Regions:
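Vicinal oxygen chelate
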Residues: 1-3, 88-121
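N-terminal beta-strand motif that seeds the catalytic metal site of vicinal oxygen chelate
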Residues: 1-21, 70-72
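Conserved active-site tyrosine of GNAT-family acetyltransferases
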Residues: 20-25, 86, 113
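Conserved short beta-strand elements that form part of the metal-binding/catalytic scaffold
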Residues: 31-66, 115-120
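Mid-chain, well-packed structural core segment of small domains
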Residues: 65-88
Length: 121
């Protein structure tokens, strides 16, 4: 079997759909791609992320107890520019608590509490 990743799915509460779409579409600058007709009624959005896609899904019953270290790592060309953009959008920067030689990074959380690692690519 030859496996590869097509998409990553993150979930947010239905009440945070607009905030999450703003976060991924405006703050992160991802391009929204059309969802197939059978998926459009479910809400959320799909975004192109290089050769992969990020699928934003809506799910009730998510709360603060769902916060964890699970994350997706996004590489950026300039860590300083990314940090500035997040700060300007009011997103809290979570410093790297376990620095790794040769790997500069920080973390943020989307409106639904999903953790994102932002690393210099």
């Amino acid at each position: 079997m030859n496996a590869s990743i097509h998409h990553v799915n993150v979930t947010v509460p239905k009440s945070l759909e607009d905030a999450a779409k703003h976060f991924y579409g405006v703050v992160m600058g991802l391009t929204e791609v059309p969802k197939p007709p059978e998926s459009r009624g479910r809400g959320g959005a799909w975004y192109q992320l290089g050769d992969l896609q990020l699928h934003l899904s809506l799910e009730d019953g998510l709360g603060a107890d769902c916060i964890s270290k699970r994350h997706v790592c996004y590489t950026v060309s300039s860590l300083a520019e990314a940090e500035q953009k997040f700060r300007e959008a009011g997103v809290e920067i979570i410093p790297d608590d376990m620095p790794t030689a040769g790997w500069s990074r920080f973390y943020v959380r989307d409106p639904g509490g999903n953790r994102l690692e932002i690393a210099q690519g």
